Amino acid sequence: MKRTKSIHHASFRKSWSARHLTPVALAVTAVFMLAGCEKSDETVSLYQNADDCSAANPGKSAECTTAYNNALKEAERTAPKYATREDCVAEFGEGQCQQAPAQAGMAPENQAQSQQSSGSFWMPLMAGYMMGRLMGGGAGFAQQPLFSSKNPASPAYGKYTDAAGKNYGAAQPGRTMTVPKTAMAPKPATTTTVTRGGFGESVAKQSTMQRSAAGTSTRSMGG
């Protein structure tokens, strides 16, 4: 009889564990799965202009043109602004800057810049743009302007960067990559001018943060 009781106790313990631990394990798994979905990346394509996009996407010429034009408007709104052409050229290189109309809320950092700007500012040319599906599964496309420097001394030299200075690798259009969904979110409008070299500093800081985040992720995966 004692042996029978012992067997029954063991069976009860196994049954209790199965009933109580399995839901906990499922709940933990569900949490990780939800976290993974929320942080999932988005696949985007990088193009230099609407023609590049149309060539890679036959039958999508209208969508490519719309995305390109929207990216240009976004670039005008969010690109780093400089009070002088010289400051912009020092950052992005000769032939890479254009004059942009002063925007509502734009304010030079000092009075000298205000007088020198004469109501207009300088900004880098849009070097390319990212194009991806609209968040939420819409039928349209989202776009994000990209900039690149041709000054070897700049941290943005030869790289695609967004208006916030985040680096997306070599400035080579026609490639596809995965980015966080936040990368395609609209950037805040530029409201002040940038000092010479200021955008390059932002790119350098962002690159350091990206490397640090990648290292942390690798260590976590490796235990």
UniProtKB/Swiss-Prot annotation:
Chain residue ranges for the region called Disordered: 201-223
Polar residues biased stretches: 204-223
InterPro entries registered for this protein in UniProt: Biofilm_formation_YgiB
Family listed: Belongs to the UPF0441 family.
Name of the molecule in the record: UPF0441 protein YgiB
Source species of the chain: Salmonella gallinarum (strain 287/91 / NCTC 13346)
Taxonomic lineage from the root: Bacteria, Pseudomonadati, Pseudomonadota, Gammaproteobacteria, Enterobacterales
